Swiss-Prot record:
Belongs to the iron/ascorbate-dependent oxidoreductase family. 2-oxoglutarate binds at residue 318. It comes from Aspergillus fumigatus (strain ATCC MYA-4609 / CBS 101355 / FGSC A1100 / Af293). This is 2-oxoglutarate-dependent dioxygenase AFUA_1G01000. SUPFAM superfamilies: Clavaminate synthase-like (SSF51197). It holds the Pfam family 2OG-FeII_Oxy. Its cofactor is Fe(2+). One of its GO terms (molecular function) is metal ion binding. It is an enzyme of class 1 (oxidoreductase). Binds 1 Fe(2+) ion per subunit. Its EC number is 1.14.11.-. Fe cation binds at residues 230, 232, 304.
Amino acid sequence: MTVNGKDIDSPNAQYVAAGIDMSDLFPAPFPTNVKTVHLETLSLAKLLQRDEDELRRIYENCKDPGFFQLDLTDDEQGVQLLQDAVDCARLMKQLLPNMSVEEKRMYKQHSRVGVYSKGYQVYDVLPNGQPKYNETVNFPMTEMLGYGDSTVDLPDWLSPHRELFQRTMRSGNKIANIVLAALEVGLQVPRGALTDAHRIQDPSDDFLRLLRYPGLQPGQPRDDLCFPAHKDFTSLGILFTWLGGLQLLASASAPGVTSGTMTGPLDIAEDAWRWVQPVPGTAIVNVGNALEILTNKALTSGLHRVVRAPGEQLPFDRYSVLVGTRPANSFPMKPLQSPQISPVLDPAAAEIATMTSGQWGTHNIGSFNNWVKARTERQEVLIIP
């Protein structure tokens, strides 16, 4: 196979999609002896065409399990986002392992508490200076695109790539709104009920997040849990990843599962978890808590976690690109009116219904900080057989 004038040998041909060679992001094959979850693959082109069967399928998959794979290769808008995500991952692969944490921390987080949409972030650092679990680089969409009251000053190691980050954000917001418009049909809400809450020009806590999960090195203490089980504080997440690590539950009714948004690493039995195998050319899309709230649980925000890569992939760094979409900060967090959405609110939902999206996000991130601190104090360690 020849891609852009370069010969691609047959083993790597499986990592080529829409003419984009991603073989460098797949340094080892996904193992064949682990239990995986089946996610439906939906077509971006068919969603744009308002194909009735595809509209039904996306609604059913967002009801349960709240995850699906979106084929981006059949529409030029999707191919653009795919290429931008690959470019972002390659950039982080070039930069992050070769810089000190002190250098990377020069990209400061937001001064306001409760928002993880800006800056470099790492929780635990090993004696060799490398992150123990993961490191993230976050870009706030509103400020990056010039829609807010302030702009983002990027450090020297990021500023030459501002246009790439901006392009990825714009493409991601377009794709998210295609998904939201499709869900409006299944939910039987007026056109614009969801998309008007997620307009790119309205101030929000939308973000682009670039992640690196360092591979396990010889002699390093084994702890397989990179990020404990949780639900996302978004409306939609659009995730690109190339190595294994993301896990979902085989059943939402597994022992230990609660209605909460977070849980400890040892609360749910190991055999309840299933691996997600990345598929070249697709993005993994998930419903977040905001969409679950706006539909009063007609749509499901699925519990998931991130662990170290399986099998031969274990020693390799894993990179991910995540576009997070949230309602505008001023949007009320009360359920939409529809025959598909129950008007009866439980006490927690009734309290949230008095908040704006911005207030709700700040409240949730504060709880998340306490959860992370408690996990560290308990010194919980997970080792997957």
